[in-house]
């Protein structure tokens, strides 16, 4: 069968869709947000493919995977095994790296185990073991006529007169020895100083290299290894000395290593992991700047922040008072005025035993002689000893991940880090960018034997590195933690892994793989997808990127609008056919008949600036950047150029620290000037709005409080005496107690992610039956949570407080979203727009700074148009917006562009351009300007 046949698809908002999709083609599904693209691609096609796979397994295997419900569809035929690559499955485990996720690290472990050369950490010489046969062959290759001495090192760096040693050698028939480099005849008296370390080598034989001496040499080497326990020194008369060893150890210090095998290179196994940080590369330590954020305060004035919330604080403070009194430390002096020694005593204590005598808050007498442990040591001890997850989470707020002082972030132990290939250990190789790592692998100098051994594994490593390079990730390193990757990056990594697997006959379903990718790298991503197609796979890609749509084999436009107004196939066919279809909104934007208009003039701003000076976090090259206030500012640049570091790590965290005294540690820079011109900071990132199913758009934006009030004033609620709290699923009373109002139960899978299953008592409604009996306009509170924003907007049209908040959610393109949709199921783009909606409800101050990280994620061009109207409204009120963005329609709207580059990773981190869109297109160095020309 050469097509996938779908009949009667009704999942979510789909309206009985019938469609045939060609197999072994690149199919792009597009449409406005909430039109039903994901419902068709993921919830119908992929879900059915997955369900059929699970059904084919044994009942034993199925019990671990749980039952997957059949999607609401009459018929699907022609399905292949399905693999989904979305944005929500990023691994947050600190042990996961780019190398482990792509499996390149597994191949590197194998490569180092087979051709790596171990070195002695002390003497920095290769550790090799050689048989007597190999030693003989090497020596016989010396030039003919070379004079050599075969020496056996029997004493190395030992004190003593060694009289017994010399006597035994005489008895065994040896005539000469070399002591500390001097040759002695054993017939003469040899006197050595008792307290000086000596080296003694037995002269086993003296030879001239020529034909016919092989068997004598072999015997001499054999004798030498027996005498010394495996070592031979070949001293070339008038030349160098060569040390051979039969053992896998350093010939100088006997440093030895277990046999090289892949597992010793794993930082997740005890054989290879650094014993101090257990293979994490960092340790959680209390941070002085977080514990004492305000150095202008004194100890008596509450400088130690955790002491404000800590039980037993009274005891700790009284101990601190007695301690400071003993060491004459003034507790009324600001922390910044204390000497380094005084501050260290307060933080880390002393080794002196002190008598602590006082009465606690409860009136109990305390009288003990003990050592004062210091504030930092006390907090770290409390963290280790507590059984309360609440206390642990609270204390973690004062901790930072500090690089392990033993392995310096390498995660591996010393012996593993002393195994090299071409001068680099496995950590050095993983620290190279993907591009440099590929270059290193291509230029490896190996012996014939090594090349033969590593041929297959090297090919696999190069292939996988090439795929990562081809999807625009050449700036990443293999050591990069998977938890720090954006949704787009992690998706492209998994895409590269799939290309590397070379599977055929697979149905891949992808969710916006172009997220976070600069236009320059987009074509490489498209080429990778076309390569997967050419292997004989079908790709269904949910995407809004115009280039991807234009190069698709088949384009499906779902719409016409969102929610109940969508769910239909508006147009399907080749990109040209869709562009010529007047009913298709996507077609009109693709063909240029409809577009986002570029502003006629740019805003002048208010004349004030935020200025970052000397920024050098990550790859930033000590740059100075000015952000003009009262403008729409766009920060652009290729992936990995340093945009997020500059805006999120340095600017945002520094401003937040100054305005809100936050505990975050900003990235490295000399200073940030102009913060006094701001009174509010709003950061709209793609982080989840909550980690549990309790969080949802209604609770996050506050509209749920108003909805609960509406239910509390209904006639039936008043008769029963129910107040607003009765309709909360977070407190006892109205909620279902079987699931504590979650609507789902969490099943811990231990080594797998937790699984949530619907509560069998309330059937996922969150409330008990009595609460569900209270209705407003025929709907109970649970049914309202199940409404989309758009439906709820109509439903509550007579309640202005509710309606206004829902209108903002609609304006940011979330009309299709259910009010009670749980936070973990929201995509990054959806989460960021929920946050934006919450902020838009507040009154503008004219001195606010809004920072948005790729707000167009998941948005159709038509939705981008609406979003830009909202953002422009914010700037027109006098506030400032800084947007990190690749979308050229957004960049074209900016009053001021800051373009970083020129490349990603080490080759980025510089300011390429600052100014208006009209000027950047004239700058030949800017990739952004090059692509922006077409839009302007």
Residue ranges and their predicted role:
Residues 1-936:
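Conserved phosphate-binding elements of NTP-dependent enzyme cores
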């Amino acid at each position: 069968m050469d097509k996938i046949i779908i009949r009667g698809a009704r999942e979510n908002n789909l309206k009985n869709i019938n469609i045939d999709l060609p197999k072994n083609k690149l199919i792009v599904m597009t449409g406005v947000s909430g039109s039903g693209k994901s419902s068709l691609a993921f919830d119908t096609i992929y879900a059915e493919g997955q369900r059929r796979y699970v059904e084919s397994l044994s009942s034993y295997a199925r019990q671990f995977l749980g039952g997957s419900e059949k999607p609401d569809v009459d018929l699907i035929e022609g399905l292949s095994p399905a693999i989904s690559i979305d944005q929500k499955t990023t691994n947050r485990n600190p042990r996961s790296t780019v190398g482990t996720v792509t499996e390149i690290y597994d191949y590197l472990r194998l490569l180092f185990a087979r051709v790596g050369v171990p070195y002695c950490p002390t003497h920095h010489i290769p550790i090799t073991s050689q048989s007597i046969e190999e030693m003989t062959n090497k020596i016989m290759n010396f030039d003919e006529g070379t004079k050599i001495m075969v020496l056996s090192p029997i004493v190395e760096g030992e004190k003593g007169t060694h009289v017994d040693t010399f006597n035994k050698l005489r008895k065994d028939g040896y005539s000469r020895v070399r002591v500390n480099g001097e040759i002695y005849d054993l017939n003469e008296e040899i006197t050595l100083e008792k307290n000086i370390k000596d080296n003694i080598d037995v002269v086993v034989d003296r030879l001239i290299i020529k034909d016919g001496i092989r068997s004598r040499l072999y015997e001499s080497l054999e004798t030498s290894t027996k005498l010394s326990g495996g070592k031979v020194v070949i001293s070339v008369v008038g030349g160098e000395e060569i040390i051979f060893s039969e053992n896998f150890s350093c010939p100088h210090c006997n440093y030895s290593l277990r046999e090289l095998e892949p597992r010793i290179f794993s930082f997740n196994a005890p054989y290879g992991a650094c014993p101090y940080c257990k293979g994490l590369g960092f340790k959680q330590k209390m941070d002085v700047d977080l514990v004492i954020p305000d150095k202008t305060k004194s100890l008596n004035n509450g400088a130690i922040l955790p002491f404000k919330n800590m039980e037993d604080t009274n005891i700790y403070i009284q101990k601190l008072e007695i301690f400071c009194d003993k060491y004459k430390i003034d507790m009324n002096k600001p922390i910044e005025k204390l000497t380094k020694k005084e501050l260290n005593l307060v933080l880390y204590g002393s080794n002196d035993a002190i008598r602590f005598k006082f009465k606690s808050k409860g009136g109990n007498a305390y009288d003990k002689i003990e050592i004062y442990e210091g504030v930092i040591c006390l907090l770290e001890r409390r963290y280790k000893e507590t059984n309360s997850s609440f206390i642990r989470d609270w204390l973690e707020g004062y901790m930072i991940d500090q690089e392990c002082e033993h392995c310096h972030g390498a995660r591996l132990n010393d012996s593993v880090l002393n195994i090299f290939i071409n001068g680099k250990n496995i950590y050095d190789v993983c620290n190279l960018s993907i591009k440099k790592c590929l270059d290193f692998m291509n230029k490896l100098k190996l012996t014939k034997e090594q090349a033969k051994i590593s041929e297959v594994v090297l090919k696999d490593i190069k292939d996988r590195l090439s795929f990562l390079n081809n999807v625009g990730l050449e700036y990443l390193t293999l050591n990069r933690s998977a938890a720090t990757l954006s949704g787009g990056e992690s998706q492209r990594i998994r895409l590269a892994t799939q290309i590397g697997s070379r599977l055929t006959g697979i149905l891949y379903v992808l969710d916006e793989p172009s997220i976070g990718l600069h236009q320059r790298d987009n074509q490489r991503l498209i080429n990778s997808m076309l390569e997967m197609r050419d292997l004989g796979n079908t790709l269904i890609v949910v995407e809004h990127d115009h280039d991807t749509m234009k190069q698709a084999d088949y384009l499906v436009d779902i719409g016409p609008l969102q929610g109940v107004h969508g769910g239909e196939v508006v147009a399907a066919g080749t990109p040209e056919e869709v562009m010529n279809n007047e009913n298709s909104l996507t077609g009109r934007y693709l063909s240029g008949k409809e577009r986002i208009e570029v502003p006629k003039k740019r805003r002048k701003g208010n004349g004030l600036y935020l200025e970052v000076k000397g920024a050098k976090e990550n790859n930033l090259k000590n740059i100075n950047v000015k952000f003009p206030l009262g403008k729409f500012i766009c920060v652009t640049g290729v992936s990995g150029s340093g945009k997020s570091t500059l805006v999120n790590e340095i600017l945002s965290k520094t401003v937040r620290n100054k305005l809100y005294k936050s505990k975050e540690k900003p990235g490295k820079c000399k200073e940030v000037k102009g913060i006094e011109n701001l009174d509010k900071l709003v950061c709209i990132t793609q982080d989840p709005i909550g980690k549990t199913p309790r969080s949802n758009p209604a609770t996050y934006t506050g509209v749920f409080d108003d909805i609960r009030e509406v239910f509390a004033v209904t006639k039936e609620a008043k008769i029963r005496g129910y107040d607003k709290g009765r309709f909360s699923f977070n407190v006892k009373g109205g909620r279902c107690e079987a699931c504590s109002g979650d609507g789902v139960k969490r099943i811990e899978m231990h080594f797998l992610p937790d699984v949530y299953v619907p509560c069998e008592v309330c059937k996922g409604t969150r409330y008990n039956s009595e609460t569900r009996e209270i209705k407003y306009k025929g709907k109970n509170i649970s049914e309202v949570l199940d409404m989309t924003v758009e439906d709820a907007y109509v439903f509550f049209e007579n309640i202005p407080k509710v309606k206004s908040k829902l209108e903002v959610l609609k304006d940011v393109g979330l009309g299709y979203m259910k009010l009670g949709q749980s936070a973990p199921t929201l995509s990054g783009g959806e989460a960021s727009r929920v946050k934006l909606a919450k902020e838009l409800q507040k009154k503008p101050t004219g001195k606010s700074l809004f920072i948005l990280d790729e707000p167009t994620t998941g948005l159709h061009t038509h939705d981008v148009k609406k979003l830009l109207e909202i953002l422009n409204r914010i700037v027109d009120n006098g506030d400032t917006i800084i947007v990190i963005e690749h979308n050229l329609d957004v960049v074209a709207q900016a009053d001021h562009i800051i373009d970083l580059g020129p490349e990603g990773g080490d080759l980025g981190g510089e300011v390429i351009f600052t100014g208006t869109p009209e000027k950047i297109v004239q700058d030949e160095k800017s990739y952004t300007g090059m692509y922006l020309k077409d839009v302007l």
